[in-house]
């Protein structure tokens, strides 16, 4: 592994500060403007926050939670907790009061950082359940209620500076006492069923991830990333430890609605996202080209054809020459450059994780001269375990295992992982831990996949999501759902169902932006999303997409019928997890009446 090695995430952070104290560390938005801070400035606030937590009586190993969107203060709070010898529990701002209380109680959190007055008020709704939480720390503004339970982050840091002055050298002793096997993070997997489980991740887990990314040799201090993923999730957290380890300048804003505007200002060289983000970009570009019609659309199709030929050449290690090179330069000027400009104009590559990326979408971006590297991991493996590299990639796969990660395919096709990134276990759940984690270190991912002759891993589906038809045929729905989303840019979500049933159907939601634009341009008036979903012309448009995908499938895999839902799936309806994964069982239960119309009494018997 890369040198130097560290005993804790905080020690790694201290090394970064000592190496490049006055270099830009990260930036965030305040009043609509970006404000940057150096590593030295970041350290001052981390030490103040850590001192403040120690003044509150936080003991080694105790949990402090963060209930906030991704922003520089999230990183400062996290590092402050770790420097005080504690461990961070993460909560999404989209969690309800009851869900937040569950995590705070289950993780035994003593302190909770809250983003704003709204999150403060949310926890006050369930204060009677939170007797063990001694302090809320408000990141934005001053407390609305002057009862001492909530103090501002500014006040915490003021107290911390005073505590550090009164106890010289004590904070450094606390930091030095933190070791690699100590708990660093409790991340609660929302899952698609049941209560969330606290995944215990140690300092060594995160150090392994940081070292692994450093070993790839693809990032450095000249890079700039735009981090919009939730830092409450392992994918976001691994980006945090990577930018600390490598000195990558990081602009942080968790507001996904500002992503396009932020790209234009930040102009990142690298960015990581979930497939949903890339699907939305794809939908906008493709529908815009189609609606341009005539010559514009023909030029777009020609450019994609040229880009596709160059992509296939590059995938085998070649480069365009002669006429193809000239055509590619022209296509870049006419088409690709516009997409790249939307993404800031400086991207070297994108990273995709958290859910399967449609091969068609990866190939589309590459045809437009934008490389998306798909990677794979789980919260239980500290996120990054397998990935494609800029110099070695295959679309439709998640790449090859990172150094220090072992992979094995079980007899039933389940992917097993082993290595330093694997969790310690589930917090206070020994039986669940024993079920997922073998005594010799192999972790059962719950994903089905296979390794090809070159060692590239392909994910077929979640083990629990595999559909087994009434005729005994196995179907991997995520692959088919991804094909449909790529074939029909007017679709937002596809939920394919058919387990133990005679045929497959799909519950589909519209991409209101692209579908609404198409409707208006075709003279179709509608009141709202629900009204739009009832329009026959839209139904025919979606059916055409389904028929195009069905033409590539075996008979038992085909979608025989579909229904356009009157709403998009969301966390608010309980149909999506915070990382935007579909909760199939919830969707199925919420729309049982629709399924009964498809299957008659079949549903009632299941």
What are these regions (language model features)?
Residues 2-5, 25-79, 96-101, 152-160, ...:
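Conserved AMP-binding/adenylate-forming core of the ANL superfamily
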Residues 21-24, 150, 157, 161-188, ...:
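Conserved pre-ATP/AMP-binding loop-to-beta segment of ANL
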Residues 36-40, 176, 184-210:
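Conserved AMP-binding A3 loop
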Residues 43-48, 180, 199-220, 337:
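Conserved structural elements of the adenylate-forming
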Residues 55-56, 83-158, 173, 541:
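Structural core segment of the AMP-binding/adenylate-forming
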Residues 151-153, 269-272, 284-393, 406, ...:
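Gly/Ser/Thr-rich phosphate-binding loop
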Residues 207-224, 231-336:
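Conserved AMP-binding/adenylation subdomain of ANL enzymes
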Residues 401-469:
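Conserved ATP-binding/catalytic segment of the ANL
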């Amino acid at each position: 592994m890369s040198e130097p090695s560290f005993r804790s995430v905080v020690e790694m952070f201290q090394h970064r500060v000592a190496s490049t104290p006055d270099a830009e560390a990260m930036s965030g938005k305040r009043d609509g403007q970006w404000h940057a801070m150096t590593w030295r400035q970041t350290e001052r606030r981390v030490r103040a926050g850590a001192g403040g937590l120690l003044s509150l009586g936080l003991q080694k190993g105790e949990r402090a939670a963060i209930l906030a969107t991704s922003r520089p203060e999230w990183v400062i709070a996290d590092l402050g907790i770790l420097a005080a010898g504690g461990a961070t529990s993460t909560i999404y701002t989209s969690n309800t009061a009851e869900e937040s209380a569950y995590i705070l109680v289950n993780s035994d959190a003593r302190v909770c950082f809250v983003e704003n007055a709204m999150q403060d008020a949310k926890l006050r709704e369930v204060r009677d359940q939170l007797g063990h939480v001694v302090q809320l720390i408000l990141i934005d503004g001053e407390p609305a209620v002057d009862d001492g339970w909530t103090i501002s982050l500014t006040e915490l840091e003021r107290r911390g500076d005073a505590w550090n002055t009164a106890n010289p050298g004590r904070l450094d002793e606390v930091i030095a006492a933190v070791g690699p096997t100590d708990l660093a993070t409790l991340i609660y997997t929302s899952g698609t069923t049941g209560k969330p489980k606290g995944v215990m991740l140690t300092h060594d887990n995160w150090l392994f991830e940081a070292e692994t990314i450093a070993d790839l040799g693809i990032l450095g201090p000249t890079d700039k990333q735009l981090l919009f993923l939730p830092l409450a999730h392992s994918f976001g957290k691994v980006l945090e430890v990577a930018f600390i380890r490598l000195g990558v300048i990081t602009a942080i804003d968790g507001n996904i609605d500002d992503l396009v505007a932020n790209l234009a200002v930040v102009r990142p060289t690298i960015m990581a996202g979930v497939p949903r983000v890339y699907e939305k970009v794809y939908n906008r570009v493709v529908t815009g080209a189609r609606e341009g019609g005539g010559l514009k659309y023909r030029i777009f199709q020609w450019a994609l054809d040229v880009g596709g030929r160059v992509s296939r050449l590059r995938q085998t290690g070649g480069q365009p020459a002669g006429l193809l090179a000239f055509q590619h330069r022209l296509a870049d000027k006419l088409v690709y450059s516009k997409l790249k400009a939307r993404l800031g104009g400086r991207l070297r590559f994108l990273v995709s994780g958290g859910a399967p990326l449609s091969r068609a979408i990866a190939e589309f971006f590459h045809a437009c001269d934008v490389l998306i590297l798909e990677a794979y991991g789980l919260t239980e493996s500290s996120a990054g375990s397998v990935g494609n590299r800029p110099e070695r990639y295959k679309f439709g796969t998640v790449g090859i295992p990172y150094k220090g990660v072992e992979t094995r395919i079980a007899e039933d096709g389940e992917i097993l992982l082993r290595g330093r990134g694997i969790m310690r276990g589930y917090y206070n759940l020994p039986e669940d831990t024993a079920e997922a984690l073998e005594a010799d270190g192999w972790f059962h991912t719950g994903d089905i996949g296979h390794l090809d002759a070159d060692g590239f891993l392909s994910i077929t589906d979640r083990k629990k999501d595999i559909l087994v038809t009434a005729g005994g045929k196995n179907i991997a729905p995520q692959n088919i759902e991804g094909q449909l989303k790529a074939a029909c840019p007017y679709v937002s979500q596809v939920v394919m169902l058919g387990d133990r049933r005679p045929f497959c159907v799909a519950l589909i939601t519209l991409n209101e932006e692209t579908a609404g634009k198409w409707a208006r341009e075709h003279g179709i008036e509608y009141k709202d999303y629900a009204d739009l979903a009832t329009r026959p012309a839209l139904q025919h448009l979606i059916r055409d997409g389904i028929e195009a995908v069905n033409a590539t499938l075996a008979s038992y895999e085909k979608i025989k019928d579909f229904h356009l839902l009157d709403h998009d799936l969301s966390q608010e309806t309980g149909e999506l997890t915070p990382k935007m994964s579909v909760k199939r069982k919830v969707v199925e239960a919420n729309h049982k009446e629709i399924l009964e119309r498809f299957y008659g009494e079949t549903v009632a018997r299941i």
